[in-house]
């Protein structure tokens, strides 16, 4: 009996040991699973938060030389290796320097128009690999150009850009055409309109030069097939910055359809440009909306070099500005300042080219708040603030007294001339004509665009009016050309060649040859 009890006790002890073993095993298993889960979670978290950066320092590289080696800097963080994913035909990658973060590219050694083995332009694509194997791409535009224009010896506040598919270089160490020199810490594209008409910008601080590229726009037929290309139209402003990131000067890039030198109009009052400053062309009285719009130039407050944008379309829809963009394609808005914003000085205006300075009532609606400065523009000697390109200047205060509205247009029926949005002016001495668009003005009170005369009503405002600044002054005001379209008066259309206006108004400019 005692033997049977012992056997039974052994069985119980064995089962107890097995139970304890299973408990220990399960406890260990779940502990391991918890640890594994924690490790997976940590690893997953680390992977999600992986930091890296791989980008070229400038978006594009342009060379005018065959077989040239170009050293392109790039920024890389947590990139352990790099390979070339693709490159334009005929281009080669000579070296990838992982110490100094540069890549050396060689342009094609030869090129002909029918050579399919060479691409004049294209994208260089690099593949970067992070420490845990993440793949990252960086791209840069490469272009081999035979066309380049150097403006560095012809420094000015405004540069006429009228050749497509060309690299341009400008001086960024002079204020206007003066010998007043600056040393910018940086130079960048401030705004442009339309988007991406100015590309691949770079600043060479050692030379004090800024380089940019202007391509082309396609011309298509009715079947949307590209049949040709042309110079793109638009405007841009480039700004120089000091070490604190403050603007110290800026320059206007005027992308226009043809050479303004070749198309100048000779009159008894001087040689005038055939188009407004900032316009693509002169519509010459066309009633086509696109032609009218391309005839509109930019707007300037009297005495300032800084251009302000056109309306969004030729008919001034809701008086809205055209869209303009920054260097990263962000939308840019102008700011409107009054005497409570610390504005109202020439220094403030130069440092804030995106500012419309509202007129000060206490100073007779000048954008200068404590005085008037008649020397900001001059017809005798081109001033540092003159907005016209080199070789051109603001017209004298009496320049438009030599003209009048073309008689046939002046006497025509309203329906025959309303759609022209402007008048042909006739030189009374020589009979030479030039068309002046009625592009309105920006109000000195609020900066808003307006292009209606005073003779419509609230429900049916009637276009149009023309205001053009001259360099002339009269007391606290400045001299402008004014004309309008007669819609209700029993007299001919209004033409005032020396109308005195508040200096805070924004008006069109028609430059005259020096």
Language-model features: locations:
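Sec-dependent bacterial lipoprotein signal peptides
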Residues: 3-44
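Bacterial Sec-dependent N-terminal signal peptides
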Residues: 16-19, 36-62, 66, 135-147
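Short proline/glycine-enriched turn/loop motifs at strand-loop junctions of beta-rich domains
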Residues: 75-81
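Short, surface-exposed loop/turn segments at beta-strand-coil junctions that are enriched for proline
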Residues: 108-117, 219, 228
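A short beta-strand micro-motif common to beta-rich folds, especially ectodomain repeats
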Residues: 114-131, 232-242
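Short, exposed coil/turn segments at beta-strand boundaries within extracellular/luminal domains
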Residues: 129-137, 244-249
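Short, compositionally biased
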Residues: 146-382, 474, 503-514
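C-terminal, surface-exposed recognition/capping segments
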Residues: 237, 279, 357-514
